[in-house]
Amino acid sequence: TGVEYGDYTINFVQGCSHGCKYPCYAFSLKKRFGQVKKYEDWLKPYLVSNTLELLDKEIPRFKDKIESVQLCFTTDPFMYGYPEVERMAIDSIKKLNAAGIKCTTLTKGILPQELAQCSSDNEYGITLISLDEDYREMMEPGAAPYAERLAALKGLHDQGCKTWVSVEPYPTPNLIQQDLMELLESIGFVDKIIFGRT
């Protein structure tokens, strides 16, 4: 992948229901390569139904090269309000872990507490760019409320899981006036924080 989150990735959903108002690189990429035409189409996600079968084929081919797998780079593995996406994410993680492969997740959804039963090498993250719900409703209307994301992350942390937060794209002051220290204090329990900007 060439990014810090993981050397391999799995994208088992096409599209994303979060409806983020800031530029979405995943949508831009899919549009550029003709896989989706309009943002409205992107907002209607669908599952790659043969994901587990594909993993059965791909894991033996790449197992010796893989250090970790990121779920997901072009969508959300725990898309808010989509239990079938959550189930596929958990099943994929379990299959990868059974092959000795570490997984890293990043979501604007709610991390299921069932993840605490998976490999202790896994890392579970949320995107958190503010604590202001009005701002979330404006900029990430289909994503989980911030408090729910934080509570799920804290729940996994309290069960001994490795946790992290991506604070990106961090909104500039012309978009919202907020106290960065308050945001950082709310995530002080995590193992790692990554910053980005709009």
List each model region and its residues.
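N-terminal [4Fe-4S]-dependent radical SAM core
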Residues: T1-S68
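Conserved AdoMet/S-adenosylmethionine-binding subsite of the radical SAM
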Residues: T51-T198
